[in-house]
Amino acid sequence: MIKWPWKSNETAPDALLPWDEALAIPVLASLSADEQSRLVQLADRFLQQKRLVPLQGFELDELKSARIALLFCLPVLELGIEWLDGFHEVLIYPAPFVVDDEWEDDIGLVHNQRVVQSGQSWQQGPIILNWLDIQDSFDASGFNLIVHEVAHKLDTRNGDRASGVPFIPLREVAGWEHDLHAAMNNIQDEIDLVGESAASIDAYAATDPAECFAVLSEYFFSAPELFAPRFPALWQRFCHFYQQDPMQRLRENAGYDGNASPQVH
């Protein structure tokens, strides 16, 4: 059990929530004791500020709420809870859900179709998730639905549409775009060679820059050993933006000893 070193002038997290049990998931295993305690404090504030809304009969309990909050706060552990401003509700379906999608093709024709979604994030509005994919986000596998949708929120924090470039200094934008597009091209080259199902990075990352940023944010936090050695320049930019280094954390706290893989600069 973790001993929470709360300062006397800080408000302790809700003791009724099962924080120790909530932390016991693989994606959080490499966090230090100090990082875990700070993450819990952020997650507690998240639950005070946001409303989790279960839909279609989904039953939300304290453990589920705590784990959802922890994953929401993982990307902003060093940025601060204010980076999650801009939405007040998280809607949670029991499973992937169907939505009406409208899109325009290259010649201007508008199409409507019903599509199955795992999650959605609106620039001004709630985040929509489903529990089946949230559960899959507990593993250190490279998939993390919550981190993906949070990344979209961070992407639009500058008030513009999602572009794959989060709120960073203007002088860093060109370099970020260069490295992000290099990663997209590399991922697409692998897809062309081995197919989507055999690609080592989720093929969704190659669809556009916004999705590349969101997908690679998933790998940044849940499978850094697949991201860092392959795209070292972009990895450093992610570390600078998130103010975290999950690869170093993995080495220090989980005894990782991986082999290097091809690099893209």
Curated annotation (Swiss-Prot):
Gene Ontology cellular component list: cytosol
Family: Belongs to the MtfA family.
Subunit relationships: Interacts with Mlc.
Pfam family, one: Peptidase_M90
Annotated compartments: Cytoplasm
Keyword set includes Protease: yes
CC cofactor note: Binds 1 zinc ion per subunit.
Organism: Enterobacter sp. (strain 638)
One record GO biological process: proteolysis
UniProt name for this protein: Mlc titration factor A
InterPro entries, sorted: MetalloPept_cat_dom_sf, MtfA_enterob, MtfA_fam, MtfA_N
Molecular function via GO: aminopeptidase activity; metallopeptidase activity; zinc ion binding
Keyword Iron: no
Main localisation: cytoplasm
EC annotation from Swiss-Prot or TrEMBL: 3.4.11.-
Domain of life: Bacteria
Binding site for Zn(2+): 111, 148, 152, 211
Phylogenetic lineage: Bacteria, Pseudomonadati, Pseudomonadota, Gammaproteobacteria, Enterobacterales
NCBIfam families xrefs: PRK15410.1
Required cofactor(s): Zn(2+)
Biological role: Involved in the modulation of the activity of the glucose-phosphotransferase system (glucose-PTS). Interacts with the transcriptional repressor Mlc, preventing its interaction with DNA and leading to the modulation of expression of genes regulated by Mlc, including ptsG, which encodes the PTS system glucose-specific EIICB component.
